[in-house]
Design a protein with these regions (language model features):
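Extended alpha-helical interaction scaffolds used for oligomerization/partner binding
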Residues: 205-210, 226-265
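A cross-kingdom marker for long, charged
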Residues: 247-322
Length: 322
């Protein structure tokens, strides 16, 4: 279902999709809080009961959880799914992949290179190079000067009493408009190539290029009401290429850039002290796109704590990195 009132257009996801993300995000909260057995069970439930596409990041996190409780055969299964579906293990995480059982260790060593080769065989280097070139083109408008101007203007957009006629604001807003125009050109090029190559995802391009593409789409502020991007983003969301968190960030960025209130408060950073009574409303909206609920320390809204979550910790946020 499409939502397009006065604010930014977005679409709501299916019950099946929402149930999966509710369960898997609960697992990841538990994992972050060291409730490992409960997290392991939640991961299993999430994967077994969902028929849709799953981002390999979830399989990798489930791998780490399984390894910590010595469920090594299950960890091996999750790791194979993660890598074959495009996951790249960061160098700072390779030391976490340890199989103590001789059988699982042998199987891991015999297969890791095969899984990696399978993953790499599906990569489109031409698409990767094109995304890298787009990032290079946008460097002029990615300097601290432009970033500072955007941050300053966004803070002003959030404050209804902010004076938008001061020389400082006017000069910074000119930079914002210049950046928006440049970002629009970059986004248009990315969208044109997406029709040819497919949406940038971990099966097609590596993690770095996926992140670059997401940044380009997030910065496409000329698409003020998300009317040009929503069909593409919603399809990518359902295919597991982008997370509910990223989808919400796009919607909220468009709202804020237009002086409107966020729909989902994603990210919550900066709104902790002001969301108050709107927390329940925001969480109900978040559920419609499969996004985990916000849990704030000393929240004024009466929210039922999520099992396994220590209220107010960093484990309550930043559950997605894709």
């Amino acid at each position: 279902m499409n939502i397009a009132f006065a604010q930014t257009k977005y679409s709501t996801t299916s019950e099946d999709f929402n149930n999966f993300h509710s369960t898997v995000s609960c697992a990841e909260r538990m994992f972050k809080n060291d409730s490992l057995l409960q997290a392991f069970g939640k991961y299993g439930t999430a994967f077994e009961n969902y028929n849709g596409s799953i981002n390999p990041t979830h399989y990798f996190k489930a791998t780490l959880c399984a390894l910590k409780i010595r469920e090594e055969f299950k960890a091996l299964d999750y790791l194979e799914k993660a890598i074959k579906n495009g996951y790249e293990i960061d160098s700072n995480k390779t030391s976490l992949i340890v199989f103590n059982n001789q059988n699982t260790n042998n199987e891991y060593r015999q297969n890791i290179n095969k899984w990696t080769a399978f993953r790499d065989s599906g990569r489109n280097t031409s698409w990767e190079n094109e995304i890298d070139a787009l990032q290079e083109e946008g460097k002029t408008h990615s300097t601290s000067t432009f970033k500072t101007a955007v941050e300053s203007c966004v803070n002003c957009f959030k404050n209804k009493t902010c004076n938008k006629t001061t020389p400082d604001y006017v000069s910074k807003y000119k930079l914002v408009k210049e950046k928006m125009k440049a970002d629009s050109i970059t986004a248009s090029k990315l969208l044109a190539s997406t029709k040819q190559f497919g949406f940038p995802n971990m099966k097609l391009v590596n993690k770095k290029e996926c992140a670059i593409a997401r940044t380009i789409l997030l910065n496409y502020d000329c698409d003020k009401k998300n009317e040009r991007l929503d069909d593409l983003l919603f399809k990518a969301l359902n295919e597991g290429y982008i997370s509910p968190s990223f989808y919400a960030q796009v919607i909220d960025r468009r709202n804020v850039m237009n002086g409107l209130t966020p729909e989902f408060y994603e990210p919550i950073t900066g709104y902790e002290k002001t969301i108050g009574k709107d927390l329940i409303i925001a969480n109900n909206k978040r559920k419609t796109i499969g996004l985990y609920t916000i849990i704030l320390p000393k929240a004024t809204a009466k929210e039922k704590p999520v099992a396994g979550a220590k209220v107010g910790t960093t484990a309550d946020t930043n559950l997605y990195d894709y």
